[in-house]
């Protein structure tokens, strides 16, 4: 992320700003993509610690994402995603694996505006790991072929998930 600003609210409010980490990824289409009723890709990625102090960790991390998408009747789209992340552990003495999965159902509302619902799951192989599960809903708007706005709410359905996490993002 080129520039980050994190605001934390608690006993003492704080704001941290600066240059974020840099991630590079490669997308290999297995089938589909621009045409057809389904698509699948494999996307390995690696994160480099180019961030300002305290914004992120200072470690190289990476993983692989496998998204699969289907066009359904009535202009519905369904997506599945599996991801394996190899991240530095909290003690900073090794790495752990995170297993991330999601299933998404989306529908065009009008023009370039679409809505979606999603179930998200994150399980870590660490000793004290807890399952994070959320039900998410949001809107996406395609500004151009390569730029998309995304706003919504993630609602935790497990104890370790945040109760509510509103978000507003842009992708390019």
Residue positions per predicted region:
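Transmembrane beta-barrel domains of Gram-negative outer membranes and organellar outer membranes
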Residues: 1-172
């Amino acid at each position: 992320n080129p520039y980050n600003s994190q605001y934390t609210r608690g006993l003492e409010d704080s704001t941290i700003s600066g240059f974020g980490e840099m991630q590079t990824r490669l997308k290999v289409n297995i089938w589909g993509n621009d045409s057809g009723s389904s698509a699948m890709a494999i996307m390995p990625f690696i994160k480099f610690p180019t961030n300002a102090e305290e914004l992120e960790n200072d470690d190289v991390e990476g993983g692989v994402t496998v998204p699969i998408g289907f066009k359904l009747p009535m202009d519905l789209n369904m997506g599945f995603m599996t991801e394996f992340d190899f991240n530095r552990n909290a003690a900073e003495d090794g790495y752990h694996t995170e297993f991330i999965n999601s299933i998404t159902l989306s529908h065009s509302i009008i023009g370039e505006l679409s809505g979606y619902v999603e179930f998200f799951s994150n399980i870590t192989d660490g000793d004290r790991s807890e399952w994070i599960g959320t039900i998410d809903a949001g809107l996406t708007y395609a500004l151009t072929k390569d730029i998309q706005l995304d706003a919504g709410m993630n609602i935790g359905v497990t104890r370790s998930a945040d109760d509510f996490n509103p978000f507003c993002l842009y992708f390019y």
